UniProtKB/Swiss-Prot annotation:
GO cellular component, one term: cytoplasm
Function: Probably plays an important role in intracellular peptide degradation.
Reaction equation(s) it catalyzes: Release of an N-terminal amino acid, Xaa, from a peptide or arylamide. Xaa is preferably Glu or Asp but may be other amino acids, including Leu, Met, His, Cys and Gln
Cofactor binding summary note: Binds 2 manganese ions per subunit.
Cofactor: Mn(2+)
Cellular compartments annotated: Cytoplasm
Gene: pepB
Protein name: Peptidase B
Matching InterPro entries: Leucine_aapep/pepB, M17_PepB-like_N, Pept_M17_PepB, Peptidase_M17_C
Entry keyword annotation includes Manganese: yes
Class of enzymatic activity (EC top level): hydrolase
Taxonomic lineage from the root: Bacteria, Pseudomonadati, Pseudomonadota, Gammaproteobacteria, Enterobacterales
Length: 428
């Protein structure tokens, strides 16, 4: 192995020969990153991306000033989806080293499963990967049940079964229980529900190539809530939390669902399918019904649900929706504490009524007269949350994945949101 390139931190500007406002410069000993005191974490992340772009695959964080946040910022920019990189980390105290190690374990897991090709990450694969991670961090405190294929139909998980039946790979529901006390009667503090569409062709409302080429990442919500629970456990979570992953491929076949089909859910709601590419809300509905039945204090669902959220926020923020102002504010406080970006978008009672159908109680997509697609999608989901006005958060995961590299990020998954949700779970 070649000798590691040393990366140091400097609070002095770079020599003029490196250019005005240079992020970094080469020194006799390696590379110096020039901090300005303004968004130093962002600067370090951008420098990490540039250093990786120069083909330097073995580096050492050296000298003074490195703490867990600066080390992590460097890694977020330096890490890419292909090729191996090694970092010799600067010395940290025991608490910071533990935090860094857990971020590397869990958030890298999230990025890896989202980046994996759909051929390798089908519904069953995703569910099993989630089980493996949580069993690793939670040990005997974790139990789970997997329901798949026709068993879903027999148990009336009609949204998940309907969406997934068109694929040769059967749909899967993972119900996982983290119960630190071991008491079967212990109250459930929170339920986390994740959309796990492992490939989304759009179904018969088929996507164009430009919108389909990143759809291996349509299980980003499932990865996010799985990682959030795992990371919360590493931070000492001592409350009972249930994880529900709704995993399926959305494919075209002779057995795939069609426009005009009507889905009858266990809570009595009927939904007319008028767009098979609005499938995420159909599978999440089953998970939210199960979550509501647990009577938890907190329900969080996460999904790469709408293009409308990306149009509003780009890939820089996750979109947050809630009727519970106090809870939404606590989530935003957790995001600020963890240096992650969330932005609240509107969700009002009238959004719940913008899904008209001539043949069912709800349409799975709003009509042309109601263009607020991210808000109406959240409104749809609210019909499957028993007490939707309190204790429910919906995350539209617009920051989960980037199709192209930018100055701070390589192409692919980001891992944004894991720390925020873990913070909320452990702080509540």
């Amino acid at each position: 192995m070649t000798e590691a390139m040393k990366i140091t931190l400097s609070h002095e500007p770079a020599d003029a020969r490196w250019g005005e406002k240079a992020l970094y410069s080469f020194t006799q000993d390696g590379i110096a990153l020039h901090l300005t005191g303004k968004d130093d974490l962002g600067l370090i992340q951008r420098a990490g991306r540039k250093i990786d772009g120069q083909g330097l695959k073995h580096v050492e964080l050296a000298g003074d000033g490195w703490d867990v946040e600066k080390s992590w910022a460097f890694w977020m920019g330096y890490r890419g989806p292909k090729g191996k990189r090694t970092v010799t980390w600067a010395p940290l105290d025991d608490a910071q080293q533990k935090e860094l190690n857990n971020r590397l374990k869990v958030i890298d897991w999230v990025r890896d499963v989202i980046n994996a090709p759909a051929e390798e990450m089908g519904p069953e694969h995703l569910a099993q990967r989630a089980v493996d991670l949580l069993a690793d961090v939670g040990g005997e405190r974790v139990s789970y049940r997997i329901t798949k294929g026709e068993d879903l139909r027999e148990q009336n998980y009609m949204g998940l079964h309907t969406v997934g039946r068109g694929s040769e790979r059967p749909p899967v529901l993972l119900a996982l229980d983290f119960n630190p006390t071991g008491d079967a009667n212990a109250p459930v503090f929170a339920c986390l529900v994740g959309k796990g569409i492992t490939f989304d062709s759009g179904g018969y409302s088929i996507k164009q190539t430009a919108f389909m080429d990143s759809m291996k990442s349509d299980m980003g919500g499932a990865a996010l809530v799985t990682g959030s629970l795992a990371f919360a456990i590493t931070r000492g979570l001592n409350k009972r939390v249930k994880l529900i992953l709704c995993c399926a491929d959305n494919m075209i076949s002779g057995n795939a669902f069609r426009l005009g089909d009507i889905i009858r859910y266990r809570n009595g709601k009927t939904v007319e399918v008028m767009n098979t590419d609005a499938e995420g809300r159909l599978v999440l509905a089953d998970g939210l019904i199960d979550a509501s039945a647990q009577k938890p204090a907190l329900i969080i669902d996460a999904a790469t649900l709408t293009g409308a959220a990306k149009t509003a926020l780009g890939n820089d923020y996750h979109a947050l929706f809630s009727f519970d102002d106090a809870l939404a504010n606590r989530l935003l406080q957790s995001a600020q504490a963890e240096n992650e970006a969330f932005w609240r978008l509107p969700l009002a009672e009238f959004h719940r009524n913008q899904l008209p159908s001539n043949f069912a109680e709800l349409n799975n997509t709003a009509g042309g007269a109601y263009p607020a697609g991210a808000s109406t999608a959240a409104g749809f989901l609210s019909h499957f949350v028993e007490n939707y006005q309190q204790g429910w958060l919906h995350i539209d995961c617009s920051a989960t994945y980037r199709k192209a590299a930018v100055e701070q990020w390589a192409a692919g998954a980001t891992g944004i949101g894991v720390r925020t949700l873990a913070n909320l779970l452990t702080a509540e």
